[in-house]
């Protein structure tokens, strides 16, 4: 309930009371620390009883609940957005607004969704490694500053990473059976379409088609990267030079480096020198408002 700037505990209890009016047994469980939502979710789904989990927070809270519930047929998950980042729900288009009220969710349809497995952690939307992940990590580090707004934190994070740190890193990238060793600015595996506040690197990505799109961007100068980033962010990768950017549909991607690789999973960052990304097909039961589409507005394949 503290994922955003304002405590939403009272609102959550009010929605729970309305769910009980539909004859549902409902519990409000509050987290006290990072990782708490995953532990609670795992404990509930391990009982074997049918359970519906409402993750009240942002993308990070939802990611924790998903990691606790993924792979359990008796469990379904949804999200009530009260956090500072809710890129996942953008995949539902105009129906995203309906997720703010549990009244729209309690009898909602279940959608089996694919996930990305990253070193054993599950990711809903996009797993990115490189400069964009480092920016995301810096945003979190700067977010508690009393002198910076949310937008100010983002701009400061971009400045720190672009001006004072190198963009690229030397990686060995394996795409199924193909091996590439080069300097990369970023590698992003896309199950969904949105991350980083609304960037859509692969607009045709769908969360239930058994296909993952991986974007590889070679290391280039700061000036060139700044020039192409808007096109990358808007999903116009086909308009960019093929020697700089490439999109593949490998099911298994591995990134290896002698230095730490920062990887961002649904807004949460991890460090590793060996990043393994694979498809977890139909791993999550997700429910939303009646008639909603998790691939609303997705471009043609």
Description of each model-found segment:
Residues 61-73:
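Short Gly/Thr/Asp-enriched flexible loops that form oxyanion-binding sites at enzyme active sites
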Residues 143-153, 203-224:
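Gly/Ser/Thr-rich active-site loops/lids in small-molecule metabolic enzymes
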Residues 1-53, 293-301:
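ATP/NTP phosphate-donor binding region
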Residues 128, 132, 188-202, 269:
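Glycine-rich phosphate/pyrophosphate-binding beta-alpha loops
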Residues 55-60:
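N-terminal glycine-rich "phosphate-gripper" loop used for MgATP/nucleotide binding
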Residues 8, 175-176, 181, 206, ...:
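ATP/nucleoside-binding phosphotransfer catalytic cores, i.e., glycine-rich phosphate-binding loops
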Residues 20-22, 29-31, 71-185:
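Catalytic core of DAGKc-family lipid kinases
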Residues 37-38, 62-63, 272:
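Short, well-ordered alpha-helical microsegments
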């Amino acid at each position: 309930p503290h994922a955003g700037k304002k405590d939403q505990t009272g609102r959550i209890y009010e929605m729970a009371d309305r769910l009980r009016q539909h004859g549902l047994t409902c519990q409000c469980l509050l987290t006290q620390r990072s990782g708490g939502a995953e532990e609670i979710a795992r404990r509930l789904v391990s009982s074997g009883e049918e359970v519906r989990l409402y993750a009240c927070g942002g993308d990070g809270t939802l990611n924790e609940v998903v990691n606790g519930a993924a792979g359990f047929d008796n469990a379904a998950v949804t999200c009530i957005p009260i956090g500072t980042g809710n890129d996942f729900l953008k995949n539902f288009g105009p129906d995203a607004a309906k997720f703010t009220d549990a009244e729209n969710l309690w009898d909602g349809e279940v959608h089996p969704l694919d996930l990305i497995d990253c070193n054993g952690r599950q990711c809903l939307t996009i797993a990115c490694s490189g400069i964009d992940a480092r920016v995301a990590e810096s945003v979190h580090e700067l977010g508690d500053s009393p002198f910076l707004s949310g937008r100010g934190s983002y701009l400061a994070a971009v400045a720190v990473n672009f001006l004072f740190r190198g963009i690229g890193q030397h990686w060995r990238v394996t795409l199924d059976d193909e091996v590439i060793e080069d300097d990369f600015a970023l590698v992003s595996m896309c199950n969904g379409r949105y991350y980083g506040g609304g960037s859509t690197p692969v607009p045709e990505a769908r969360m239930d088609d058994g296909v993952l799109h991986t974007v590889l961007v070679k290391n280039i100068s700061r000036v060139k990267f700044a020039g192409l980033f808007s096109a990358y962010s808007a999903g116009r990768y086909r308009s960019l030079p093929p020697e700089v950017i490439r999109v593949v549909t490998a099911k298994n991607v591995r990134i290896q480096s002698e230095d730490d690789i920062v990887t961002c999973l649904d807004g949460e960052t991890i460090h590793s020198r060996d990043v393994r990304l694979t498809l977890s097909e139909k791993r999550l039961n997700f429910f939303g408002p009646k008639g909603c589409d998790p691939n609303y507005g997705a471009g043609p394949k």
